[in-house]
A protein has these predicted regions:
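Buried hydrophobic positions in well-ordered alpha/beta secondary-structure cores of metabolic enzymes
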Residues: 14-17, 70, 128, 173
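Glycine-rich phosphate/diphosphate-binding loop of Rossmann-like nucleotide-binding domains
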Residues: 16-23, 151-212
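Short, polar/charged alpha-helical segment
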Residues: 21-32
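N-terminal glycine-rich phosphate/adenylate-binding segment common to multiple enzyme folds
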Residues: 51-148, 155-156
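N-terminal beta-loop-helix "entrance" segment that forms/cooperates
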Residues: 37-58
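Short, ordered loop/turn segments at secondary-structure junctions
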Residues: 13-15, 46, 77, 111, ...
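A structural signal for isolated positions on well-ordered beta-strands in alpha/beta enzyme cores
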Residues: 9, 40-42, 183-185
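Single conserved hydrophobic/aromatic residue that forms the stacking wall/gate
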Residues: 1-7, 11, 211-212
Length: 212
């Protein structure tokens, strides 16, 4: 932001969540102090603490509060230990991802000065992963779960790839590439997954033609 203040919603969660969020907010405050900015931190309880108080691990009201903030700091949690969804065990990161449509999982990788690396030229790249589709069973079905076991010895996972999802992740990938070294690699397995990865590759190539 270019303004002199910002607001951030902080979700501590449980386990090492408080430790993680404290370190994150310390870094945030230090960065803002350097540029003579301030931040208002709004803390929300989620996870098991929320489940005990509100019978849900993530209250819907929190999403509305997050809309008014400039960012969200999400602490860690052990959502695999939560009760079923119908008993209030919502995965906070999944709820946030779906509600705000956070489709791009942006992961920079860069070696630091003074640290040795086996790559002579160093590392400075960004991995752009589509975050709303694929094999994960919490995001590949409109209703129900995209995983099933027809027998006790057989498990099946359904993969969901759409033209919309493939196109927009390619678009943001090219946007980042244009602002950096103008190099982009689309990673796929279209030689085997001909329909699903084939559709992704088709979309990535279509987007590339608009950036020539």
């Amino acid at each position: 932001r270019t303004s002199s203040s910002a607001a951030s919603d902080v979700y501590k969660r449980q386990g090492i969540g408080p430790e993680i969020t404290k370190a994150s907010t310390d870094v945030l405050k230090a960065a803002l102090d350097k540029f003579n900015m301030s931040v208002e931190l709004i803390y929300e309880e989620i996870g098991f603490v929320s489940l005990k108080k509100h019978k849900t691990t993530f209250r819907k009201e929190i999403l509305k509060i997050g809309e008014k903030c400039d960012g969200i700091i999400l602490g860690t949690c052990s959502h695999n230990d939560y009760p079923p969804t119908n008993e209030g065990g919502l995965n906070p990161s999944g709820v946030i991802r779906k509600y705000y449509d956070l489709y791009a999982n942006v992961r920079p990788a860069k070696n630091r000065l003074g640290k040795s690396t086996k790559f002579p030229m160093g590392i400075d790249c960004i991995v752009m992963r589509e975050n709303t589709e694929g094999f994960y069973s919490d995001r590949n079905m409109y209703q129900g779960v995209g995983e099933l076991m027809p027998t006790k010895d057989c498990a099946i996972s359904i993969r969901n790839i759409t033209r919309k999802g493939s196109t927009r992740i390619a678009e943001i990938g090219f946007k980042y590439a244009q602002e950096r070294r103008k190099k982009l690699v689309a990673i796929h397995k279209a030689n085997v997954l001909r329909f699903s990865d084939g559709l992704f590759l088709e979309c990535a190539r279509a987007v590339s033609y608009t950036h020539l």
